[in-house]
Amino acid sequence: MVTDDGILFSVRETLADIPDPELPCSIVDLGLVESVAMDEHGNVDITLLPTFTGCPALDMIANDVTRLVSDLDAVESCRVHWVFDPPWSTDRITEAGRASLKAHGVTVPTCGGDPSSSGVQLRTSAIACPWCGSRDTRLDSPFGPTRCRTIQYCESCRNTFEDMKRLDPEDGTSSPGAG
C-alpha cells in the first residue's frame, strides 16, 4: 500500500522535473511551488506563485503540472491554483536554480531578506557578468525577452546577458538592474 507521504513525495519529485518554459530551471528550483496537498480520495491541490502578473507561461505551467501529476498512480485528480500572496520573489530561487540560470547567462539578485532591518543600504547598479565576473556592466534595455528579465551589457567581455528583475518588497513593482 502506498502511503500519503509516498504519494506526496512522488508529486514533489514530478514537480521538480517540470521545467519553466521561459527559464532554464524547474518550477521547484524557480520557487513557484508554494504548497502541495492531497485529500483522502487522491485529489491533489497544488498552489503556485507566478513570477509576474500576466506571465504568458502560466497556462502552460498549469497544464504541465495537471497532466504529469494526474498521470501518477494513486492520484485521482490534480488542481492547480495560482495565488499572489505571498508574492513570488527572486529570494525563492534555490541554489541549484541560481546555478542553472547563471550557467545560461541569467543573473539573479542575491537573497535580500528584509531591507528595512539593517541600517545603511549601499546599492549599486553594477551587476556581475555571468560570463567573465566583471562588474563593469550596465543596463542595456529594461525590456528583456520576458517581463521578468532585463538585458544587461558587460563592457569588459562585450557580451550581453539577462538579469532577473528585482521586486520592490513594499509595492511589488519591479526595478530593472537595481542590484
Residue positions per predicted region:
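Short linker/helix segments within small regulatory modules
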Residues: 141-151
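Short edge beta-strands and adjacent turn/loop segments
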Residues: 22-49
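Short, non-transmembrane amphipathic alpha-helical segments
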Residues: 11, 51-76
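Short metal-binding segments enriched for Cys and/or His
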Residues: 156-173
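Short functional micro-motifs and their immediate structural scaffolds
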Residues: 134-138, 162
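N-terminal presequence-like segments and adjacent domain-start helices
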Residues: 1-16
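Short cysteine-rich clusters marking metal-coordination/redox-active sites
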Residues: 129-132, 154-157
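Cys/His-enriched microdomains
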Residues: 53, 127, 152
